């Protein structure tokens, strides 16, 4: 598994990617990564998990008492064991936090070579987080980025 760290542009592209913290790499995360790998395989592209070295809440709400379940190294190890080709560890900065979802999607395409974005069934991103899956699909169509919704993982009592 290749690991890229920092907010640097990648010269090589062609990824099917998903994005999230993946703290704990729980069954829902594992299910999402399974979908990611299937989509990447069907499209003949490499799979990529985009995550953050530190939790975005530390930038959004500095001074809060936020505890992580796993270290970055533990998350990377488990994600690698799940068969992901590449992990991109972004730095979550105030500038990144200020991006609207469409601009963030454009950045993923231009700077990281993402061609398809696999979204968790209830995942939202962008500075306002006021958009829904259909909005991301519309942005993707405008930008030339395919957006796919992963299947919902049903835990014993509720979706995960």
Where are these regions (language model features)?
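Nucleotidyltransferase catalytic core that binds NTPs
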Residues: 1-160
């Amino acid at each position: 598994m290749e690991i890229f760290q920092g907010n640097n542009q990648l010269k090589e592209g062609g990824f099917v990617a998903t994005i999230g913290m993946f703290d704990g790499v729980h069954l829902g995360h594992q299910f999402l990564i399974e979908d990611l790998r299937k989509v990447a395989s069907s499209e003949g592209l490499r799979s990529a998990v985009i995550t953050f070295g530190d939790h975005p809440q530390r930038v959004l709400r500095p001074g809060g008492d936020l505890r992580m379940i796993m270290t970055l190294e533990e998350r990377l190890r488990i994600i690698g064991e799940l068969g992901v080709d590449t992990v991109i560890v972004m730095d979550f900065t105030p500038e990144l936090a200020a991006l609207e979802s469409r601009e963030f999607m454009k950045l993923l395409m231009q700077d990281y070579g993402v061609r398809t974005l696999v979204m968790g069934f209830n995942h939202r991103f962008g500075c306002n987080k006021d958009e829904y899956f259909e909005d991301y699909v519309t942005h993707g169509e405008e930008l030339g980025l395919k957006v796919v919704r992963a299947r919902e993982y049903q835990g014993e009592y509720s979706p995960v």
